[in-house]
Structure formats: structure tokens, C-alpha cells
């Protein structure tokens, strides 16, 4: 059974992709050297590094944790609708890639009980420390913080039923390497979910480099070496694709 990728965008867009083993050898190494492009003139909100025609955005640092936890987020993004659309079930092992301070991780923790776990992955230890403190404060025992890197998630191969990235993928400095790694972490039949602000809609009040079109997500995620196959796009959120 193939692994699946679910793309979720606020005004949701869901894509399911199947992950294959990346090709190895000299040809792939040569391609890697040409994978990214640096431009001197670029969007000030981006890092000047481009991948498949898209500029990579600056990462939201620990100083932005309060924005992730803002009281108006449910009203603006309807996170409860997102969680419902994920169709989580008891016993699922779910990876929250770029978990930040754990807002999404905490929302997913209850629907997968009993027996389920959330693997909360982030590159910033300060975010993981904050998440851990929230879990202890609220008595949440099935969320496990994992320190990742710019090129590796820290997840074991074939270990998760679903991996989700909420407003995160567009900030990856090495998106190709991260997708290759995450696709390997999916169990057979597993799902990879992208949630991104809709670049198709100019009315979405987010900086342009922090948006993605559904077409761009599919272009990047459906490369043959990942073995991911698009499943569906779900339109339920006010601002994002799922």
C-alpha cells in the first residue's frame, strides 16, 4: 500500500501523496547542486533562496510564539474544522512538523486516544520547551517533543500514520530534503498533510512569501522520487488550503 499525502490549505486544500524511496547515486548528487537558486533581488520577507520558482520565507522564531497562541486564532483560522477534516482515529501516531509551541499538537492529542501519540517536531528548542511546559500544566501525556534539523525531521522510518505541516512548509530552508525525509517516515498508506495560506486569493491578509498555491505544493510534493500521490483538496477553512 502506498503512503499518501494530504494537502490542507486554509480555505482548505487537501492532497494525498505516496512516498517512494529517493533515487540514489551520482545523477541525484549532481542534481542536488542545482536544486536551489540564490537571487540578490528578492522579497524582503524571504531569504533570497528559491526552490522550483518559489522564494523561501523567513522562519518565525520563538518571539512569534505569542502570535501562534493568539486568542483570535480559532475565529480567524477555524482550527476545530481543520482537526475534524483530518479524520483522526484512536491509536494514530501523528507527526506535527514545525509544531512550534504546540497549538496543533494539543488539539490532535485527544482525538487519537486511547493509544495514539503526537510527535511534535521543531528545530527550535525554546519552542519545544514551551510545548513541554504546556503539556505538563494541562496533564497531556501523549505528546512527545522531538528536536529536528533543517534537513531531517528526527522521525524513524515507517513510524507515523500521518504527518502534518501547518503554515510551515514554505519556511523550510531545505524543502526537498525535508520532504524526502518525511515521506520515509510515513507508514504504508500514511498521509502527508499540507496546510498553507491560499496564494490564489489576494484577499488573504498574509505576506506573499508566506502563501502557497495548491499547484505549487503539488509541483514540489509529487516529484517521482518521493512516491507521493495526490488524494484530494478539502475546502473548509476561511484562509488556508488543506
Residue spans of the language-model regions?
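Conserved class I S-adenosyl-L-methionine
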Residues: 191-218
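Class I SAM-dependent transferase core
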Residues: 28-95
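Bacterial N-terminal signal peptides
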Residues: 7-15
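A short glycine-rich, Lys/Arg-flanked "PGG" loop and its adjoining helix->strand segment in the class I
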Residues: 109, 176-191
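A short acidic, Gly/Pro-enriched loop at the edge of an enzyme's catalytic core
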Residues: 153-162
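Class I SAM-dependent methyltransferase SAM/SAH-binding core
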Residues: 95, 99-152
Amino acid at each position: 500500500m502506498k503512503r499518501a499525502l494530504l494537502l490542507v490549505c486554509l480555505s482548505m486544500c487537501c492532497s494525498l501523496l505516496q512516498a517512494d524511496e529517493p533515487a540514489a547515486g551520482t545523477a541525484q548528487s549532481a542534481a542536488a547542486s542545482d536544486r536551489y537558486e540564490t537571487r540578490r533581488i528578492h522579497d524582503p520577507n524571504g531569504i533570497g533562496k528559491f526552490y522550483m520558482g518559489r522564494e523561501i520565507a523567513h522562519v518565525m522564531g520563538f518571539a512569534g510564539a505569542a502570535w501562534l497562541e493568539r486568542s483570535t486564532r480559532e475565529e480567524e483560522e477555524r482550527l476545530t474544522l481543520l482537526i475534524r477534516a483530518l479524520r483522526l482515529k484512536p491509536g494514530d501516531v501523528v507527526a506535527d512538523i514545525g509544531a512550534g509551541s504546540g497549538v496543533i499538537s494539543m488539539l490532535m492529542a485527544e482525538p487519537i486516544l486511547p493509544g495514539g501519540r503526537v510527535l511534535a517536531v521543531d528545530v527550535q528548542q525554546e519552542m519545544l520547551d514551551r510545548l513541554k511546559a504546556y503539556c505538563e500544566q494541562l496533564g497531556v501525556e501523549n505528546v512527545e517533543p522531538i528536536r529536528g534539523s533543517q534537513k531531517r525531521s528526527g522521525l524513524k522510518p515507517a513510524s507515523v500514520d500521518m504527518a502534518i505541516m501547518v503554515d510551515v512548509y514554505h519556511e523550510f530552508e531545505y524543502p526537498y530534503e525535508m520532504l524526502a525525509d518525511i515521506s520515509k517516515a510515513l507508514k504504508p498508506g500514511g498521509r502527508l498533510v499540507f496546510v498553507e495560506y491560499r496564494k490564489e486569493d489576494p484577499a488573504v491578509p498574509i505576506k506573499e512569501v508566506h502563501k502557497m498555491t495548491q499547484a505549487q505544493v503539488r509541483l514540489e510534493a509529487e516529484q517521482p522520487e518521493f512516491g507521493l500521490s495526490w488524494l484530494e483538496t478539502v475546502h473548509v477553512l476561511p484562509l488556508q488550503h488543506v
